[in-house]
Amino acid sequence: MRVGLSWEIRGEAPAGPLWTGVIDAIREADALGFESAWVAETQGSAAACTQPAVFLTYAARVTRSIHLRALGRSVKGEIPVRLAEEVTLLDLFSHGRGGVAYASGRSQSIAPSAVHEVIEFARAAWMTNEIRYRGDHVRFPEHTPDSAPRGPSYIPWEGEYVPQWEWGAARSTADFLALTPKPMSIHVPTYVSIDDDETLEWAARNGVSPYAGVDLTTAEACERLARYRRIADSVGRHGFEVDAVIESNVALDGASDAHTFGGSTHDIACAIREAAAATRASHFVWRHRPGTPGDLGRFANEVQVKLQA
């Protein structure tokens, strides 16, 4: 089982020390062999991290192997092309370690289909050259007509390729465009929060990795991931196509509650394994908060080894 850490940076304290503390923790996690580091998008406070992909692009320069994921990325009010480009740059600067988890439509007070279209567009644009996309919320290029097929479509072969700079005055607008630069891999790790039913079903049917976040109770997360898996199985999708994530708090030698795995390190490892067995989750993410010095090392040495054995 993969094991990662996540952070939600917010508060009215100066951003510099808080951000530096998270970067230092990511560096420590990288040295300890954690699989992933997730930084959530936050808004509305002095220390908020409004652009987690940019934050993690810096983290890419001071780490070697840990995978870097922008978490809870909103699409409301954003330009889909820009969202795809920022993840591409994170992936390039990290030499293939970048990825993104999108927030659900419900958490943004927008239609779930708006999130679905952004994900579908980005995946198509990363994979191939010139495309166009027509949806209810996303159009690329913007002048794509209503007569275009829904979703992504691809430039037809017309017997000869003429570069755009040779078109001349008779034709100045491209109907299909390429997103450049391209990421290291055509399949950039892409996740979506499954805290609304419409997105859960859409993600299961379309092979998008599910993210059961810390705001869900453990019982709710397990129920939703298990339902995701049942739907995916029913349409012939395989578990190895996705990376199913369960995120939770951890209390080393502390009490368990609805949102927290607590107890001894052995108890915590057993509880996480139980949740994974019930859901076929492949990735556990600990929502990390400032705690006892050395807690990352202890978790790595006493819990992570039992999850990866």
Question: Which residue stretches match the model-derived regions?
Answer:
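Alpha-helix-loop-beta-strand connector modules within alpha/beta enzyme cores
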Residues: 50-70, 121, 301-309
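Internal, glycine-rich beta/alpha segment that forms the wall or movable "lid"
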Residues: 79-206
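N-terminal beta1-alpha1-beta2 module of alpha/beta enzyme domains
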Residues: 1-63, 188, 289
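Acidic (Asp/Glu)-rich catalytic clusters
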Residues: 27-31, 56-65, 87-98, 202-205, ...
